[in-house]
Amino acid sequence: MTAPHTSANDRVIIFDTTLRDGEQCPGATMTFEEKLEVASLLDSMGVDVIEAGFPIASDGDFEAVHEIAKRAKNAVICGLSRAGAKDIDRCAEAIKPAKQGRIHTFLSTSPVHMKYKLQMDAAQVYELVISSVTRARNHTDNVEWSSEDGTRTEFDFLCKCVEAAIKAGASTINIPDTVGYSVPEEYYDLFKRVRENVPNSDKAIFSVHCHDDLGMAVANSLAGIRGGARQIECTVNGIGERAGNTALEEVVMAMKVRNDKLPYWNKIDTTMLTRASKVVSAATSFPVQYNKAIVGRNAFAHESGIHQDGMLKNAETYEIMLPESVGVKQTSLVMGKHSGRHAFIHKLEEMGYKLGQNQLEDAFVRFKALADRKKDIYDEDIEALVDLEIAQSHDRIKLVSLTVIAGTHGPQRATMKLDVDGQTKIEEAEGNGPVDAVFNCIKALVPHVAKLELYQVHAVTEGTDAQAEVSVRLSHEGRSVTSRASDPDTLVASAKAYLGALNKIVMKRQRDMAAPAAAAS
């Protein structure tokens, strides 16, 4: 927890929108179960407000928000809504089970948005601000209003809309830098001036929401806080549309490490930041770049001889924060084929995993199989293995075995055995290379029209026996799904990743088919 100050005026509310704005990032779609896991972790680590989704967008989004609202223990559960009555009412229904619920309604206010997107004039927009907030306020006393494209909105009109929204009952006012256009000095000045010019500004909490199109989302968010905002809207790993959103882990640690210049506090348990990063990365199949601040693999790694020498003498020579403060251990416990079940369970608990008995047994079997093929097992290996086990626990299509014949001459041929809904299927296929042969096998065993958009491979750890981690993105009916899998055998990892994406498509189709039936009953 980052709380050296006790003044309520210095407290910053952390509003996480990983499950809403983050999931809007192309290819970052999460399953229902993955959303519940991410929400549970965010709740546990001290996030104040979880924006769980956009209920009107789909039945799946509604169900996820509704279920998260049921399960949340501490966080306010928020749903996003446009300004229309149907949107607001649907959002209210979704958050109804929450101990603390919030409706977040928004409306564009910039000249370019009003003219081309809304095709409305300023007077119409102003009236809609009032009516939408009033309707939301009839459902809950916790209403947030956002001025979409607020940083490109004419200042006087922005102040007029903010004043009206507060008067209509909004307790939080968000002025987002929707297109990532602002610079810190400008964003600081905007909040300072709005708060000075809106007569009832003291009756609401002001919020920042920044995008990273110019690489300044974190800097702008902190500038907005200095300008008087007291809520930061952010996502784990900074995922989001286009270049992404403000990274939760970065703003939280900036306030903690540089509290001398940023004298604010929040309730986040920073030791859970790395775990949150890994869970979101696994759920979205978006790898975290190695040099990512705070949670990147190299954030606490030192290879230069000069740096290593300094670190050995005193860690403060090159580290401005302790690795343990963000949940990173300085040393990795190396495990191998002689490690037993007890040691494995202890290691999982140490790493923050909580598995069911069946998942635990399956993960241990996978671990022992990996240990027989790999000399040393590192934390990264175990994370990759367990994340795959969690992802596959709901799969309807599972890989049983794979044999590939490849070489410099002759065709590349793959033979694959799959378990499809409990039924074993075997097929052989050729391809232009071993990976193509593997994917052709899958297409023969499970006929589908999904298109391969992305295929990437990188090593989980170092060495010739390192596990390969493969990312596969498939597009189906205008929707992209991404999956990752790891294995010492690159071709096996490729098959698992492709099947993982295919399983997501199957689960999505199954949920879409179930929704009308549930509504009819």
Curated annotation (Swiss-Prot):
This is 2-isopropylmalate synthase. The lineage of its organism: Bacteria, Pseudomonadati, Pseudomonadota, Alphaproteobacteria, Hyphomicrobiales. Its main location: cytoplasm. Residues 12-274 form the Pyruvate carboxyltransferase domain. It comes from the Bacteria. The keyword Transcription does not apply. Homodimer. One of its GO terms (molecular function) is manganese ion binding. It catalyses: 3-methyl-2-oxobutanoate + acetyl-CoA + H2O = (2S)-2-isopropylmalate + CoA + H(+). Its EC number is 2.3.3.13. Pathway: Amino-acid biosynthesis; L-leucine biosynthesis; L-leucine from 3-methyl-2-oxobutanoate: step 1/4. The gene is leuA.
